[in-house]
Curated annotation (Swiss-Prot):
Species for this entry: Oryctolagus cuniculus (Rabbit)
Record has Ribonucleoprotein as a keyword: no
UniProt note on tissues of expression: Expressed preferentially in neutrophils.
Descriptive protein name: C-X-C chemokine receptor type 2
Presence of keyword RNA-binding: no
Function (record text): Receptor for interleukin-8 which is a powerful neutrophil chemotactic factor. Binding of IL-8 to the receptor causes activation of neutrophils. This response is mediated via a G-protein that activates a phosphatidylinositol-calcium second messenger system. Binds to IL-8 with high affinity. Also binds with high affinity to CXCL3, GRO/MGSA and NAP-2.
Cellular-component GO terms for this entry: external side of plasma membrane
Record key words, sorted: Cell membrane, Chemotaxis, Disulfide bond, G-protein coupled receptor, Glycoprotein, Membrane, Phosphoprotein, Receptor, Transducer, Transmembrane, Transmembrane helix
């Protein structure tokens, strides 16, 4: 598809639904000359965003690489949950590779053309959807293992790998609209942007493509997690399963951090949707408030990609031991120092899979 030019794009098509869509998590273009409300969200913050993106990129690159290394190094004792967490680390690492590009675009505008616009936008979408879908899979796995305390077909590792592959496939399908409609756009008197081009049906399709992915890629998996963890926690507390409860701390922390990072963005996006459909009256003040909120919550969502390894380092005893074991094997720390670290015993559930490498 050729790069988009402003001459073929009508005012109504663009500003008629001048939205912060994109379940893709990135902010809309700032078109000061074509909007009746002067945007106040990005101009003064571009360098703050740039620095934040670069820091998240470096932390995510290091942290998720270490997580993958530890899990793969311990693959002989790798549990079902570890397979899911490995895929989470892969998703976050892939997303981190796009952050330098997004950081540069915040300062200089989108100067990378349409092909790269499509690719990096697709990676962002797939990262988000795969993250919440894999967390939903973990919640179902823990629900079956603890609440029903039975070994199920889902515990077989080759089937778990198939489930992970399926989640990647679903994430890709949910992200296809971004691949199809994203283009480099060159508005007059403004920096180029990476944004949706849907022709004469921009307003209609943008709302459809906002609601459907939000329903199937966020709300439904969130309800699954809520159901599973409510009953899982109830079972743990009723049975006084202290050891299993401690083994679940890492998983609960991962889910909680995901929600803390992404729920604010989705709530702001919901508010923006209500404003676009005139359920909430739109004013210049409210529009700028929404733009600023999306700016801030997007950064919070991006921050998530580097937080899981930090959780593992502070809460996951087995992750710390596994990392020290790798360092000792390569002579980077003494074996005497490793011996001082008592390896925590693996906690076995009825399904044999409550323990994780992390």
């Amino acid at each position: 598809m050729q790069e988009f030019t402003w001459e073929n794009y009508s005012y109504e098509d663009f500003f008629g639904d001048f939205s912060n869509y994109s379940y893709s998590t990135d902010l809309p273009p700032t078109l000061l000359d074509s909007a009746p409300c002067r945007s106040e969200s990005l101009e003064t913050n571009s360098y703050v965003v740039l620095i934040t993106y670069i820091l998240v990129f470096l932390l995510s690159l290091l942290g998720n690489s270490l997580v993958m290394l530890v899990i793969l190094y311990s693959r002989s004792t790798c549990s079902v949950t570890d397979v899911y967490l490995l895929n989470l680390a892969i998703a976050d690492l892939l997303f981190a590779t796009t952050l330098p590009i997004w950081a540069a675009s915040k300062v200089h505008g989108w100067t990378f053309g349409t092909p790269l616009c499509k690719v990096v936008s697709l990676v962002k979408e797939v990262n988000f959807y795969s993250g919440i879908l894999l967390l939903a899979c973990i919640s179902v796995d823990r629900y079956l293992a603890i609440v029903h305390a039975t070994r199920t077909m889902i515990q077989k590792r080759h089937l778990v790998k198939f489930i992970c592959l399926s989640m990647w496939g679903v994430s890709l399908i949910l992200s296809l609209p971004i691949l199809l409609f994203r283009n480099a756009i060159f508005p007059p008197n403004s920096s180029p942007v990476c944004y949706e081009d849907m022709g004469n049906s921009t307003a209609k399709w943008r709302m459809v493509l906002r609601i459907l992915p939000q329903t199937f890629g966020f709300i439904l998996p969130l309800l699954v997690m809520l159901f599973c963890y409510v009953f899982t926690l109830r079972t743990l507390f009723q049975a006084h399963m202290g050891q299993k409860h401690r083994a679940m701390r890492v998983i609960f922390a991962v889910v909680l951090i995901f929600l803390l990072c992404w729920l604010p963005y989705n709530l702001v996006l919901l508010t923006d949707t209500l404003m676009r459909t005139h359920v909430i009256q739109e004013t210049c003040e409210r529009r700028n408030d929404i733009d600023r909120a999306l700016d801030a919550t997007e950064i919070l969502g991006f921050l998530h990609s580097c937080l899981n390894p930090i959780i593992y380092a502070f809460i996951g005893q087995k992750f710390r031991y596994g990392l020290l074991k790798i360092l000792a094997a390569h002579g980077l720390i003494s074996k005497e120092f490793l011996a001082k670290e008592s390896r925590p015993s693996f906690v076995a559930s009825s399904s044999g899979n409550t323990s994780t490498t992390l």
